Amino acid sequence: MNKERFDVAIIGGGIVGLSLALNLLGVGARVVVIERGSLDDMAAATFDGRGSAVSAGSQLILNGTGLWGPLSASAEPILEIRVADGTSPLFLHYDHRDLGKGPLGWIVENAHIRRTLAQEVKKRGLPVLEKVPLSAAHFYPSYVSLDLDDGRSVEARLAVAADGRHSAVREMAGIDAVSWSYPQTGIVCAVEHEVSHQGVAHEHFLSSGPFAILPMTKNRSSIVWTERNEFAAKIIKLDDATFAEELHSRFGSFL
């Protein structure tokens, strides 16, 4: 059986895997992505409340490879960061003007990142073996051979495991992982507010865990609410009005 050969094979076509693949493709590397899901599903992604912070350094990389242009319309600049311990009126204050001309970073909806990456993959002709899981990986001194569930096989000088925290590639490579569980749950949502957030990100370290308010486009904020498991389970089941009351007790009335 003839095997396709590449410089880099990236297993996992999520945000990390596709971003790396497009960057490597831009510098002339022969790259293939192996993804058990579908690019069409990524291209049809809708807002699920989650956003990602893009640092100034990451923005430079994305800009250099032409990815920042299509992302920028949905990117909200972070101009200030305010960090407080509990309900203390005192806070640490970071201002972009103290560090340089540009923002401290940006918040971008995950759904928009996924759609943009899927579109750029098709536009640039990046090879993606989709809708097929990896069945085996064979590691040699100078290359790796990857077998797919549908009988295909590829070889690459380098394999990148971008298939998540329960990485099958990591396990196939015999790389151990140490993990533990915190008795906490992350509740993520987005809110619209009347007062402009002015590009300010807030983070409060409460006894139950961090509570973050991150600026988004269209005068919205992404909420990352960490809560104890037993209480979080009750919060998630609340109706919208009662949930809003619980959120307001932590959010406050400044927005």
Where are these regions (language model features)?
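Conserved Rossmann-like nucleotide-cofactor binding loop
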Residues: V16, L39, H166
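N-terminal FAD cofactor-binding segment of flavoenzymes
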Residues: T46-G86
